[in-house]
Regions:
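Short, aromatic- and glycine-rich surface loops/edge beta-strands on solvent-exposed regions
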Residues: 48-59, 150-163
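Short strand-edge motifs at loop-to-beta-strand transitions and within beta-strands
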Residues: 38-42
Length: 177
């Protein structure tokens, strides 16, 4: 995976003490990643590399390089598409970007929302308000307080910081309870 330290366990008969090598676009070194088996660590250094080859002696194995999972947005414990009580906005005053992939092995990877747009509607006119950071602004919270049960809230253009660099997240839409 790009942006994380990948654990590698190498078992190569007859090559004890031989340091593995890796193709361009990555680096390999002795070490371990907490919580994983492995005596080597691979880090991807080229953001465009699609695969890397690890070699030990005469044996080489190619590995596909994967991107980190797409960020998913939550407000409190509520996912996009959920009905969300207005009271949530008194306790949860930010957009959280999380990894919603049960097969992703790295549980300590963190994402942070860096920018979003909040869609508002007044007198039939829709407009968006760009916010830098992940906090819900006072203006936005006041707008939500005015809304009624059944009204929708929508966040678009969500930008997220990840260990592998900036990413775009899908929008967030919810209906107020």
């Amino acid at each position: 995976y790009r942006g994380v330290k990948n654990p590698v366990l190498i078992v190569a008969k007859g090559n004890d003490g031989v340091m593995p090598s890796i193709s361009d676009g990555a680096k390999i070194y002795s070490g371990n990643v907490p919580g994983f088996d492995g005596q080597y660590v691979v880090e991807i250094t080229d953001p465009d590399v699609k695969s890397v080859t690890i070699s030990v002696g005469e044996v080489s194995t190619q590995f596909r390089v994967l991107n980190l999972p797409t960020p998913t947005i939550k407000i409190g414990e509520y996912w996009s598409g959920n009905e969300i009580p207005k009271s949530v906005f008194t306790n949860s005053t930010q957009l959280d970007a999380v990894i919603d992939d049960v097969n992703f092995p790295f549980k300590d990877v963190e994402y942070t929302v860096t920018q979003y747009s909040y869609m508002t509607e007044a007198n039939g006119i829709t407009s968006s308000h760009v916010v830098n950071g992940n906090k819900l602004t006072e203006e936005l919270l006041k707008d939500i307080k005015k809304k009624r049960s059944g009204d929708k809230i929508m966040f678009i253009g969500i930008k997220v910081s990840t260990p592998a660099g900036p990413r775009n997240a899908p929008g967030y839409t919810a209906k107020l309870k």
